[in-house]
Structure formats: C-alpha cells, structure tokens
C-alpha cells in the first residue's frame, strides 16, 4: 500500500492507472476506520482492480458546536487496517492541501439537502458535496462506494454526480451493524456500555415501523411519530427527528402508495452523542384500502 498526501501526486497516479486500463474504486472516509469501512473496501475490491481509500476529516462539514476537534484520528491504526484490507493507495491529505489559501468555492445541492440533516446541520451538505467533488476529481475513480447508513448523504452525492455529469458510478453498500442492531459508526466509541446497549432500540423501532407498513398501514407521518415515541421510551434517548421520505426522490412522504419505496430515517441523541440510522421499505404493488 502506498500512502499519498499530495493531491497532484494522487491525480498523476490515477491518470497512469487509467492509461493502463486499471478500473479504480474509491472509498472516502474521515478515518477512525471500523468494520463498516472495511466492508466498503471489500465491495470496491470486488468491482475494481485498484482501490483507493481516502482519509480526510473535512472541516467544512462540521458545524460550530460539533465534534471536529475531538473527532478520533488514529492514523497509524487506520493505515494498518487499510493495508490489511487490501487497499492499494491511501490518500490522506492535510486540510491545507484540500483547502489552500484563497479557496472560495462551495457546492450546494438544494432540495434533497434542505431537509432532515440539512435542516438540523446548516452547511453540512455543502461541505460534503464540495469535498466529495474535490476527492473525485483528485482520485479519478470509475466507481465510488458509500454506505447506506448515511442515506441522505448518499442521496446528495448521487444528485451532485448526476447534475455535474461526473463520470463515476456511485455504489451503495449495506449498513454494518453490531449484535444489537446498532449501526456501526466511528462515533460509537464515545458511547458508554449502557448507552451502547440502549441504542439497539433505534434499529428495533425502525424495524417495527417496517413491520407495520408490511401489515398494511399507510399513514407515514403518524407512523414516524409512533416510532419516535418508541425509540425514546425504549432507549431513554432524546429523539432529534424520525421521518419518512420517498426512496426515489428523497422528498418527505406522508402516505404510503402502492408500488413505491420509502425510507424511514432517525437521528437520536445518546447524551451528547448524535446517532443516525435508517431503513428502507418497498411497498407491494397493492396496499389494502387503496383503490386500484
């Protein structure tokens, strides 16, 4: 595995790989690697001959009162994990290399980025869209793998790639989970043992919502409210939001229609730690009580 810190050097390497007809896959991370990240690397490895992993704690996607300065940065451990996972190139630039003096460009993506995480974390998705676009331009991959845990981020990236005609295939990878259903996340290290156990209620509650949809419920707004109540009751955590969106448009949805797919998303505070998760439901072609 070769570690690269200079964007120009990384671009040069990728250009040579492309000239050699090597299929390039990229996995973008902020470090603090865990088994979820490794699963993304494995998926990239299945589809590409060369895998690039990026580690960059992006300052522009953190709000003023968020955890940028204390976000874990165990670089040596991350590098060892990346090497053992079969990563070919580790791209780990400093902030000044990505945002040099005079940098003044930002990408905004209206619509999908305006609700939920976008509403709760102003400027977050602009930071995400900008750094992802830069990293795509630097690594020049044929495909980029992102986890479904950050479902809204995935939707934003897909929108940006489509709107800006970026020639890359966006691949979604399923969420890795701990034994109690808690979505694997770098921020889970902040949780106490008790919080970690209680956090299993998030996934149980989302699954319960999908079960109710499968049983014929169609009122998504009411079901989201009931799910928020269940999460709070079973975990003792403060719920930031629970909401349904249409899977195709990622716009808010209040009633399930036949033949449509919906995603329920939740954000929860376990003490001062913010956890997010989601689950997808594919509606049958007929829903009880709905006219054909």
UniProtKB/Swiss-Prot annotation:
Kindly state which keywords UniProt assigns to this record, in alphabetical order.
ATP-binding, Cytoplasm, Ligase, Nucleotide-binding, Pantothenate biosynthesis
Pathway of this protein? Answer: Cofactor biosynthesis; (R)-pantothenate biosynthesis; (R)-pantothenate from (R)-pantoate and beta-alanine: step 1/1
**GO terms assigned for molecular function:** ATP binding; pantoate-beta-alanine ligase activity
Q: What is its main location?
A: cytoplasm
Q: Where is the active site?
A: 37 (proton donor)
Q: Name one GO cellular component term.
A: cytosol
Which catalytic reaction applies to this protein? (R)-pantoate + beta-alanine + ATP = (R)-pantothenate + AMP + diphosphate + H(+)
Residues at which ATP binds? 30-37, 147-150, 184-187
| Cell location | Cytoplasm
Q: Which residues participate in (R)-pantoate binding? A: 61, 153
GO process terms (BP): pantothenate biosynthetic process
Under Enzyme Commission nomenclature, its number is 6.3.2.1
Report residues binding beta-alanine: 61
Task: Write down the NCBIfam families for this protein, in alphabetical order.
Answer: cyt_tran_rel, panC
Report the function annotation for this chain: Catalyzes the condensation of pantoate with beta-alanine in an ATP-dependent reaction via a pantoyl-adenylate intermediate.
HAMAP family membership: PanC (MF_00158)
Q: In which family does this protein belong, per the annotation?
A: Belongs to the pantothenate synthetase family.
Q: Any other comment in the entry?
A: The reaction proceeds by a bi uni uni bi ping pong mechanism.
Protein name stated in the entry: Pantothenate synthetase
What organism does the UniProt record list as the source? Chlorobium phaeovibrioides (strain DSM 265 / 1930) (Prosthecochloris vibrioformis (strain DSM 265))
